[in-house]
Amino acid sequence: MTLRLLFLALNFFSVQVTENKILVKQSPLLVVDSNEVSLSCRYSYNLLAKEFRASLYKGVNSDVEVCVGNGNFTYQPQFRSNAEFNCDGDFDNETVTFRLWNLHVNHTDIYFCKIEFMYPPPYLDNERSNGTIIHIKEKHLCHTQSSPKLFWALVVVAGVLFCYGLLVTVALCVIWTNSRRNRLLQSDYMNMTPRRPGLTRKPYQPYAPARDFAAYRP
């Protein structure tokens, strides 16, 4: 009789422990190409039956509370986030979905869902799951977009400088050609300029004394 009572007691406690355990299912890995992600936590319990508190934790030891929301079957939960994160959420009978945005590479980590049933008693929470590794990929799009812009900017600057240098060279050549032509014309004008009129020098004639014709008169 005593053994039978002991067996019934152990069976009762095992049923109670099993009933008080809430299992949670999470995706093992989420790879994020953008800066947003939705993480769904499915529980083996009807969430609408009680007032609950749903939380999302970051880290192997669940050190950082990322997002938390309180709700029940009469009103939607109000989610609030850690200062480092931006989050919102939604729920149905067995699922709580956390939405995170403005994520960066340093947010890559393992995340755990937790559910706590606050009222009516008894207090219940879920068994620790294996968690979800959220991997945020580093963006290279900005670099690939900025490189062509930088390239074309350099091309435009080089083109402007080339055109400016070409114009300056042409202008200097024209100025040099005109200057050289003017010097040649001035030299020709100087050679063709007539001399100023003056006294002309008479040709030299040898001296011959004038004859006195009166002396020969009779």
Curated annotation (Swiss-Prot):
The modified positions for Phosphoserine read: 187
Q: Which residues carry this modification: Phosphotyrosine?
A: 189, 207
Q: How is it modified after translation?
A: Phosphorylated by LCK. Dephosphorylated by PTPN11.
GO BP field: apoptotic signaling pathway; CD4-positive, alpha-beta T cell proliferation; immune response; negative regulation of gene expression; negative thymic T cell selection; phosphatidylinositol 3-kinase/protein kinase B signal transduction; positive regulation of CD4-positive, alpha-beta T cell proliferation; positive regulation of inflammatory response to antigenic stimulus
Loss of function: phenotype? Cd28-deletion mice have some defects in germinal center reactions and antibody class switch recombination, but in principle are still able to mount cytotoxic T-cell responses to certain viruses. However, T-lymphocytes show impaired responses to lectins with a lack of interleukin-2 (IL-2) production.
Positions of transmembrane segments: 151-177
Which stretches of this protein does UniProt put in the Cytoplasmic compartment?
178-218
Q: How does it sit in the membrane?
A: Single-pass type I membrane protein
Q: Which GO terms describe its cellular component?
A: external side of plasma membrane; immunological synapse; plasma membrane; protein complex involved in cell adhesion
Origin superkingdom: Eukaryota
Q: What's this protein's function?
A: Receptor that plays a role in T-cell activation, proliferation, survival and the maintenance of immune homeostasis. Functions not only as an amplifier of TCR signals but delivers unique signals that control intracellular biochemical events that alter the gene expression program of T-cells. Stimulation upon engagement of its cognate ligands CD80 or CD86 increases proliferation and expression of various cytokines in particular IL2 production in both CD4(+) and CD8(+) T-cell subsets.
> What name does the UniProt record give this protein?
T-cell-specific surface glycoprotein CD28
State which gene encodes it. Cd28
